[in-house]
Amino acid sequence: EITEPPLVELINSPSLQRLKGVHNGGPCQYIHQGLEQMTRFNHCVGVMLLLRHFGAGLKEQLAGLMHDVSHTAFSHLADYVFGGDVYKLDYQDNILGEFILKSEIPEILARHGLAVEEVQDPHGFSLLEQKIPDLCADRLEYSLAHPMMARHLAPLSAQNILAHVVVEDNKFVMNSATVAWKYARAFLSWYTLELAGPRCVAAHQILADAIKRALTIGALVKEDMFGADEQVLRKLRAANDPHITQLISTLTPEFDCVIDGLHPDLKSGVKFRYIDPLVRTKNGLIRVSQLYPDFGRELLEQKDKFHLQQF
């Protein structure tokens, strides 16, 4: 049970509550069924709970709650709409500090004797955030909580994975090479086939094109993107623009696409995400890719494939 006043107040704040209407996968929610619970709110709370489980202090838990508060509607779609780098997907990171300062969050923290500067940078907390390919609460939560990950992990479960995650020197490592290898392989398969598969990448570009068109004709303004997914979608439908209508009508579970480098209808890309956990062995901390060279080669092959996609 969460009883600490600053955590409770932050969870109930307008900035956090808005995230209940922001889907982690953006337009992927329309082409994959059963992902309704994958919201930025649930992710942020899940990250906070993971940090709590592994003994992180109050400030790191608060930072975990806040780390995605600057996401726009449809999450990473902002990088496609506003000219961000789709191979980094860091639009929300770049505006996080400014977004927090303009929100009610500093006032909430001040009421509990905390300065916003103490908790607003997620990269100042080593359990919360680490660079790829290391484990962190953010990466653990968004992979292990995702319904599609389950079939890639099977017969292992998220609980099996977390049972072998330990904290050393305030960083996450794993104490079973076999479990770490299975998790890393499942993550790679899940991400490349599902989250960053052709259908999801194409769906991001299609919805981004619709939103850019709406911004151009005045059916949307930039501030609308800091609402919820359905609010933006309603405005797209209300635009009564044939091009917008045609684009958003394609985003259904029946949507499919074909990779075509010769005569593409659209071009897009996406960030390459993977994990290569450090494993505690009798010879010290060693990465999965070193313990399992075949996995290391598979990682390199997938990295080479992850470039501009044309459909």
What does each model-identified segment do?
Residues E1-K59, A73, L77-F311:
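Histidine-centered, transition-metal-coordinating active-site segments
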Residues E60-D68:
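Short alpha-helical catalytic segment bearing the HExxH-like zincin motif
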